[in-house]
Amino acid sequence: MFFSRGSLGTVEFAFTKRDGGRSEGNFASLNLAASTAPGLGDEFSDDPSVVKRNRSILAAAFDVPHIVAMTQVHGSDVVFVDGATVEAPVADAMITDQPDLGLLVRAADCTPVVLADPQARLIGVVHAGREGLVKGVVTAAVREMRRRGATRIQAWVGPRACGLCYEVPAEMADAVAAVVPEARSTTSWGTPALDVGRGVIAQLKAEAVHVTDIGEGVCTIEDEAFFSYRRQGKASGRQGAIVVLRPAGDRE
Ligand SMILES: [Zn+2]
């Protein structure tokens, strides 16, 4: 179920992989997204009731009554979840100060990021693909946390497509590198590519965020322990990252 699970003070988080759920076929087994290819028909989508069970399995593993996931649109909007919101906000980053509320970000080859400032009691998740990288969604999330009082933000960057696999047209590589030079890469076969994870990490470091690269050396396209849009096509599931803020005083 978990590729990596960790904690920092009262903050607990994990990055998931494919195993441990109930979905079948391309979605086997811990698929966390019901509508991965909207409008393409049932064969491209997992059974929503099974996805709900998968999310319940994750909620149980973290002992949280609710998990909030976003309707991710490759944008840069940041939503603050105040606890009243249990429906999926349309955004690619969300922040909360609510204890025992799971924040979930989902990705196949995009970069999932967990943010936390345990002292300020603020946590967040970010979904950053190529478009989110260019639009600066990670930077926007960090700045929103600071605006709400965060001073020492830690980021964990999860498994994603690596820069040796994520081939893109030359013009696209140029356009992204014009905004985030660190994201420029070359595939193992010598063609233009992007390393979105490296770009995201550069953006975090530019904001003086302390970064732990959980996904270093891992590639969702190459490793079948993960879902991959590039490897599996439109009918692919989504892994995710979850973060939970525990009540103050619960533990050190
Ligand atoms: Zn790779």
Predicted regions, residues:
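Active-site microenvironment for binding and transforming phosphate-containing groups
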Residues: 1-252
